[in-house]
Amino acid sequence: MAAQLLFTDEEVTEFKRRFKNKDTDKSKSITAEELGEFFKSTGKSYTDKQIDKMISDVDTDESGTIDFSEMLMGIAEQMVKWTWKEEHYTKAFDDMDKDGNGSLSPQELREALSASKPPMKRKKIKAIIQKADANKDGKIDREEFMKLIKSC
C-alpha cells in the first residue's frame, strides 16, 4: 500500500490500533455510525452530513465505509496538505521579514497586518505579539510564528 511508505512501522501499528478501536463491530471497516460515536467520545460532534462527507472524501471503493488502507491514505493526504500550508506560511513569514534577520519586529508585523483589509488596529497587533512571543524578546521568530499560525 503506497500510503504505508510515508509512515514508520510504529506509526502504522498505532494507526491500526486506533482503527481497530473505532471499528466496534469488527467488520474491518468504519461506518458512519462508528465514526460519529468515535467523535462523540472525543467531545467533538459533527452532523450526519459532515460525517458522510468525511467518509466519501476517503472512500475510494465507494463502499460507504472506510477500510484501513483508505484511512491511511486519508491521513497521508492531510499530511501533504499541511506540508503545503507550512510552506505557504514559511513564505508569508519570509515576505514579512523585510530585513531578513529571521524574526518579525513589531514594526514588520504592524506593516504586514496594517495592510490587511480592514487594517488591524495597533492594540490587536500588540496582543498578537504578546501571545506569540514565547521567549519574550519583543520579536516573533519563525518557530513562534508557526506555533501562532497552528493555534489559529
UniProtKB/Swiss-Prot annotation:
Binding site for Ca(2+) 1: 23, 25, 27, 29, 34
Region (Disordered): 95-121
Positions contributing to Ca(2+) 3 binding: 97, 99, 101, 103, 108
PROSITE patterns: EF_HAND_1, EF_HAND_2
Gene3D superfamilies membership: EF-hand (1.10.238.10)
Tissues expressed in: Found in cell lineages giving rise to the aboral ectoderm, a squamous epithelium covering the surface of the late stage embryo and larva.
All copies of domain EF-hand, residue ranges: 10-45, 46-81, 84-119, 120-152
Keyword annotations: Calcium, Metal-binding, Repeat
Residues noted as binding Ca(2+) 4 in the record, renumbered to the chain: 133, 135, 137, 139, 144
Reported function: Calcium-binding protein involved in larval development and metamorphosis. Likely to function as calcium buffers mediating the transport of calcium from the sea water to the blastocoel where calcium is required for skeleton formation.
Name of this protein: Calcium-binding protein SPEC 1A
Organism: Strongylocentrotus purpuratus
Taxonomic path: Eukaryota, Metazoa, Echinodermata, Eleutherozoa, Echinozoa
